[in-house]
């Protein structure tokens, strides 16, 4: 018999179920009072049905392994407060009742599960909810930093101007700060340190999951889909010194991968790794995906997605892929992999199932190299044409991007040769050291008109290349108008002006340029994922491009037939120019 985990409202009360290796006590909270009720269990699953308990009741659990630790239901839908790190959370035997959020009994969402609006080839717009809206002048101050702000007419108008097909929300489920951040006076603002996989962080949705449902509906009515970035590779319980908040307290050996010596596997760089080879872990992941599908979202981006398919190594036929494909709620959703982790054999670009899209860092790096001046035109052409060397000769599954939340913003890419992460408190050691960036002669801000012109030309060349590329493309919020993080390429802990999108002084000329690119791409069907039917590659002098010319060529021209017209893409590194044009084909008689 299948088990309905979490808190399920039934006639006259609520039914609770949780998985645990040791006996569990249900804790019901009424203001400061706590009522403890032993649960009954079999085969590691513990149950209780309590009369008179209904929607809005607050609860938690205590497991016999350490009853001092209040634990959050892994299947919780709503929490009464955010997580805040405290050293006591990781100390065995110390009571954490005052430190841990309570779950709130909440009915599941039931939005219509319509087909996704997003189709491959469209523009994905990656954003951080807080960072995107905290400084938005048109959003009411009380609404800034929340999911509801994304439904504001001014936000939707901006997205429509760019022809955004779907926004991709960086993690929204409840997370906790890494333990080194509070002593530095910093907080994690990106959310890639989740505790439970379904409950939205109360800072982003004070009214709970209903706010996500309403925002998704508003965006869908404007023709914009929503993709959620979900983290199923680790949790914020971290390493052996980390906090005990949920899974660790219930059954550490079940949920987390361990080496033969009993130590935690760390293929994520965060201290622990979820063991997705276990059916119980996959059931939790699938439960989260179904929950958010019922909120109306188009699909999901999987952080460090190689973890999903790890045995000891990566298995392209791992059970979770078939389970997602067979699920009636999930089979039609958009699935996007970040196709790597830091474990052995973790880099798996091109190896995910045929219906999954994949972040293509080869595209990012080859385009950057070309415009920096040390890459080949041949590699650039391969990336623009859909990366058939990675995804095969058919429809491409690439997600092309130049910048993402990790790394430099696009404006910083052409303004800084080195990272400047001192504000993160790690002596500038964190973040990637090799960014394939360049500063155009001066590190950081410059008032020199010539340098500013070169940087502007580089930005336009990069952006035009992106919008001319075959396959799905992704733009990170603010890159369309020159957002800077002051050279910080790892702004995960900058919940301040460094990490927030600055709207007032944005480069409106660049923004208009990107809007024009988006319009040209849509009008001329450059968003195709199918292979080019009739591609004519030319050197800049008009001659046919030959294999021996690709490596040292300063650019090329690609001509694509489109009915009675021809689309021409001309890339010239010497002049820092990308030209896109449509012209009528004149037949000679």
List the predicted regions and their residue ranges:
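Conserved, mostly hydrophobic/aromatic
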Residues: 18, 61, 127, 169, ...
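Structural beta-strand segments of beta-rich domains
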Residues: 12-16
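Conserved alpha/beta catalytic core and glycan-binding cleft of carbohydrate-active enzymes
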Residues: 76, 89-93, 99, 104, ...
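Short proline/glycine-enriched turn/loop motifs at strand-loop junctions of beta-rich domains
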Residues: 19-24
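Substrate-binding/active-site clefts of carbohydrate-active enzymes
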Residues: 128-297, 305-326
């Amino acid at each position: 018999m299948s088990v309905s985990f979490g808190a399920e409202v039934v006639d006259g009360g609520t039914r609770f179920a949780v998985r645990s290796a040791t006996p569990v006590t249900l804790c019901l909270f009424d203001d400061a009072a706590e009522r403890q009720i032993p649960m009954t269990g079999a085969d590691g699953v513990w149950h209780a049905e309590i009369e008179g308990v209904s929607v809005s009741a607050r609860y938690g659990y205590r497991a016999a392994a350490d009853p001092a630790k209040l634990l959050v239901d892994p299947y919780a839908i709503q929490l009464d407060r955010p997580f805040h790190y405290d050293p006591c959370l990781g100390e065995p035997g110390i009571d954490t009742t005052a430190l841990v959020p309570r779950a709130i009994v909440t009915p599941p969402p039931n939005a219509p599960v319509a087909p996704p609006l997003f189709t491959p080839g469209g523009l994905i717009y990656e954003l951080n909810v807080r960072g995107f809206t905290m400084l938005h002048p048109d959003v009411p101050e009380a609404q800034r930093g929340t999911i509801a702000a994304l439904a504001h007419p001014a936000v939707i108008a901006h997205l429509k101007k760019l022809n955004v097909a779907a926004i991709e929300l960086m993690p929204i489920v409840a997370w906790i700060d890494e333990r080194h951040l509070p002593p530095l006076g910093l907080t994690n603002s990106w959310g890639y340190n989740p505790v439970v996989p379904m409950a939205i962080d109360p800072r982003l949705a004070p009214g709970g999951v209903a706010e996500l449902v309403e925002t998704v509906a508003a965006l869908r009515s404007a023709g914009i889909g929503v993709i959620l970035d979900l983290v199923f590779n680790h949790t914020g319980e971290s390493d052996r010194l980390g906090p005990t908040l949920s899974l660790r307290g219930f059954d550490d050996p079940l949920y987390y991968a361990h080496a033969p010596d009993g130590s935690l596997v760390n293929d994520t760089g965060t201290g622990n790794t979820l063991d997705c080879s276990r059916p119980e872990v996959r059931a939790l992941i699938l439960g989260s995906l179904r929950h958010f599908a019922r909120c109306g979202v188009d699909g999901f981006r999987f952080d460090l997605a190689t973890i999903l398919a790890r045995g000891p190594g990566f298995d392209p036929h791992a059970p979770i892929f078939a389970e997602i494909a067979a699920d009636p709620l999930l089979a039609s959703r958009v699935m996007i992999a970040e196709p790597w982790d830091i474990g052995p054999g973790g880099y798996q670009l091109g190896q995910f199932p045929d219906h999954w899209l994949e972040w293509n860092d080869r595209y990012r790096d080859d385009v950057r190299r070309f415009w920096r001046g040390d890459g080949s035109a041949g590699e650039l052409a391969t990336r623009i044409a859909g990366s058939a060397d990675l995804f095969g000769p058919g429809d491409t599954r690439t997600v092309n991007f130049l910048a993402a939340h990790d790394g430099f913003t696009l404006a910083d890419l052409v303004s800084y040769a080195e990272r400047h992460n001192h504000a993160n408190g790690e002596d500038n050691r964190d973040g990637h050291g090799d960014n394939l960036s360049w500063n155009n002669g001066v590190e950081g801000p410059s008032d020199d008109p010539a340098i500013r012109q070169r940087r502007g030309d580089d930005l336009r060349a990069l952006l035009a290349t992106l919008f001319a590329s075959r396959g799905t493309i992704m733009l990170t919020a603010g890159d369309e108008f020159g957002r800077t993080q002051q050279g910080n390429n790892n702004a995960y802990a900058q919940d301040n002006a460094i990490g927030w999108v600055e709207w007032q002084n944005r480069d409106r000329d660049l923004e208009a340029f990107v809007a024009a690119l988006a319009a040209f791409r849509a009008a001329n069907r450059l968003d195709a994922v199918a292979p080019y039917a009739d591609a004519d590659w030319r050197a800049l002098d008009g001659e046919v491009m030959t294999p021996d010319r690709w490596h040292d060529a300063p650019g090329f021209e690609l001509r694509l037939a489109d009915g009675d017209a021809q689309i021409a893409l001309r890339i010239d590194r010497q002049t820092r120019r990308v030209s896109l044009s449509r012209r009528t084909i004149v037949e000679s008689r």
